[in-house]
Amino acid sequence: MGSIAGFSSAVLSKLGIPVPYAPRLLAGGWVVAGWAGLAYGVYLTVIALRLPPGSELTGHAMLQPAFKASMAVLLAAAAVAHPIGRERRWLVPALLLSATGDWLLAIPWWTWAFVFGLGAFLLAHLCFIGALLPLARQAAPSRGRVAAVVAMCVASAGLLVWFWPHLGKDNLTIPVTVYIVALSAMVCTALLARLPTIWTAVGAVCFAASDSMIGIGRFILGNEALAVPIWWSYAAAEILITAGFFFGREVPDNAAAPTDS
C-alpha cells in the first residue's frame, strides 16, 4: 500500500491537487476508490450496451452488489486516516452508509431494497451535513453562494412537484419528501462550506443530479434508461466530496490526527 500511496500523492500533485497533510493511506485509498468507481462504471456501461434500452442493469452477477459498494467502502477506509478528528467521525459513517445504499440498490429482487437504500443514503446525507455544518458557519456567505443555495432549493421543490403525483402508488410520498429535504440540506451546506477548493460543493451538486435521475427513472420513465449516467454522476459525487475534505488543507493544531505509516 505504501508504494501505491506514494504514487497516488505524486499523481495528485501533478493534477494540481495539493496534499499538504494527506497521509499515505488516505491518498492511496482515495485513488484506489476512484479506480474502483471507474471500473464499475465501465462494467455497467458494457452491460447497458449489450441489452435493450431501459433494461435492468443490476442483478446480473452474484458479486455485483459488492462491486458497486467497493468504491464507497474504499473511501471510508481512506477517511479513517483523515487527520481532522471531528470530520473523520462523520465522514466514515457517511461513506459506509453510502456503501450500504449502493449494495441495497443493486439487489432489485428484494421488494424493500429501494426503501432501505433510500434510508441508508438519507442517513449518509445527515452525516455529511454533520461534517460540513461547522465549515458553513465560518463566515457570512457570498452572494454567489446564496444564489446557488436558492437555485438548489427551487430545483428541489420543482422535482418534488414533478414526482408528487407518482409517489402515492408505492406509498413513497413521505419517504421521498423527507429524502429530498435531506439531500437539499446537504447540498446547500456544501455550497456554503468554507473549503480551499470547490470539489466538495461540485460533488454535492453531482450527488443531487444523480439522485434526480434516479427519481426520473423510477417515477417518470419507469425504467433503467438513466442507470449509466446515474452511476457516473454518483461516482463523481463521492470522489469529489471526499477530495474537498482530504486535499489542499492545513491541519489545525488541535486536530486529532491518526499516525501515518
Swiss-Prot record:
<keyword id="KW-0843">Virulence</keyword>
<feature type="transmembrane region" description="Helical">
    <location>
        <begin position="29"/>
        <end position="49"/>
    </location>
</feature>
<keyword id="KW-1133">Transmembrane helix</keyword>
<dbReference type="GO" id="GO:0016787">
    <property type="term" value="F:hydrolase activity"/>
</dbReference>
<feature type="transmembrane region" description="Helical">
    <location>
        <begin position="227"/>
        <end position="247"/>
    </location>
</feature>
<dbReference type="Pfam" id="PF07947">
    <property type="entry name" value="YhhN"/>
</dbReference>
<dbReference type="GO" id="GO:0005886">
    <property type="term" value="C:plasma membrane"/>
</dbReference>
<comment type="similarity">
    <text>Belongs to the TMEM86 family.</text>
</comment>
<feature type="transmembrane region" description="Helical">
    <location>
        <begin position="90"/>
        <end position="107"/>
    </location>
</feature>
<comment type="function">
    <text>Specifically hydrolyzes the vinyl ether bond of lysoplasmenylcholine (pLPC) and lysoplasmenylethanolamine (pLPE) to release a fatty aldehyde and glycerophospho-choline or glycerophospho-ethanolamine. The cleavage activity is specific for lysoplasmalogen substrates, and there is no activity on 1-alkenyl-sn-2-acyl-glycerophospho-ethanolamine or 1-alkenyl-sn-2-acyl-glycerophospho-choline (plasmalogen) substrates. Confers a growth advantage for mycobacteria in host macrophages, possibly by cleaving toxic host pLPC into potentially energy-producing products.</text>
</comment>
<feature type="transmembrane region" description="Helical">
    <location>
        <begin position="172"/>
        <end position="192"/>
    </location>
</feature>
<dbReference type="GO" id="GO:0006629">
    <property type="term" value="P:lipid metabolic process"/>
</dbReference>
<protein>
    <recommendedName>
        <fullName>Lysoplasmalogenase</fullName>
        <ecNumber>3.3.2.2</ecNumber>
    </recommendedName>
</protein>
<feature type="transmembrane region" description="Helical">
    <location>
        <begin position="146"/>
        <end position="166"/>
    </location>
</feature>
<feature type="transmembrane region" description="Helical">
    <location>
        <begin position="197"/>
        <end position="217"/>
    </location>
</feature>
<dbReference type="InterPro" id="IPR012506">
    <property type="entry name" value="TMEM86B-like"/>
</dbReference>
<feature type="transmembrane region" description="Helical">
    <location>
        <begin position="111"/>
        <end position="133"/>
    </location>
</feature>
<keyword id="KW-0812">Transmembrane</keyword>
<keyword id="KW-1003">Cell membrane</keyword>
<keyword id="KW-0443">Lipid metabolism</keyword>
<keyword id="KW-0378">Hydrolase</keyword>
<dbReference type="GO" id="GO:0016020">
    <property type="term" value="C:membrane"/>
</dbReference>
<keyword id="KW-0472">Membrane</keyword>
<feature type="transmembrane region" description="Helical">
    <location>
        <begin position="65"/>
        <end position="85"/>
    </location>
</feature>
